[in-house]
From Swiss-Prot:
GO terms for biological process: regulation of intracellular signal transduction. One of its GO terms (cellular component) is cytoplasm. Interacts promiscuously (via SAM domain) with EPHA5, EPHA6, EPHA7, EPHA8, EPHB1, EPHB2, EPHB3 and EPHB4 (via SAM domain) (in vitro). The lineage of its organism: Eukaryota, Metazoa, Chordata, Craniata, Vertebrata. PROSITE patterns: SAM_DOMAIN. It comes from Homo sapiens (Human). This is Sterile alpha motif domain-containing protein 5. Residues 79-88 have a biased composition (Pro residues). It is found in: Cytoplasm. InterPro entries: SAM, SAM-SH3_domain_protein, SAM/pointed_sf. Residues 75-119 are annotated as: Disordered. The keyword Magnesium does not apply. Keywords: Cytoplasm.
Length: 173
């Protein structure tokens, strides 16, 4: 069985039986899954109407989450409520910029220019969803945590040589 984000997504929808078909048809990432429609479900082999509805509804939610994700900040632990901020105060992000302010959308994308109202409250995410969001962001940004500068390989030959040359005095005991 495949072990990736699409499998976890289908498992959450209680439809893990389609995971292998999704991957075989090229739907191995949630970004790709956001494009799924009825013809795609036919090709994947999702024939049950209830399963099709569940998947299409989940795809719609994925698209909405992507549209609402621009400019959101989150915390891993809940923070105590501040003592009565003024009603006209604008929450600030990590860098002191106002959330939803001019810092959004400066990378050339149109996500910062949506007209839908957004909540300025802190959002709590379940652990799995947060892991998925972080993984997707790392993939989008081309960051590989298993490669330098984020990690380095320890040469196996060096470890073996060290163990082979372990002090002879400790072996004679």
């Amino acid at each position: 069985m495949c072990t990736n984000i699409v499998y976890e997504w289908l498992k959450a929808l209680q439809l893990p039986q389609y995971a292998e078909s999704f991957v075989d048809n090229g739907y191995d990432d949630l970004e790709v899954c956001k494009q799924i429609g009825d013809p795609d479900l036919d090709a994947i082999g999702v024939l049950a109407p209830a399963h099709r509805r569940r998947i299409l509804e989940a795809v719609r939610r994925l698209r909405e989450q992507d549209a609402n994700a621009a400019g959101l900040y989150f915390t891993l632990e809940p923070q105590p409520a501040p003592p009565g901020p003024p009603a006209d105060a604008v929450p600030t992000g990590r860098r002191g910029e106002p959330c939803g302010g001019p810092a959004q959308g400066t990378r050339g994308d149109s996500r910062g220019h949506t007209t839908a109202p957004r909540s300025r409250e802190l959002v709590s995410y379940p652990k799995l969803k947060l892991k998925i969001m972080i993984r997707d962001k790392l993939v989008r940004d081309g960051i590989h945590l298993s490669k330098p500068p984020y990690s380095r390989k320890v040469p196996m030959a060096g470890i073996l040589e060290y163990l082979m040359n372990w002090p002879k005095s400790s072996q004679s005991r």
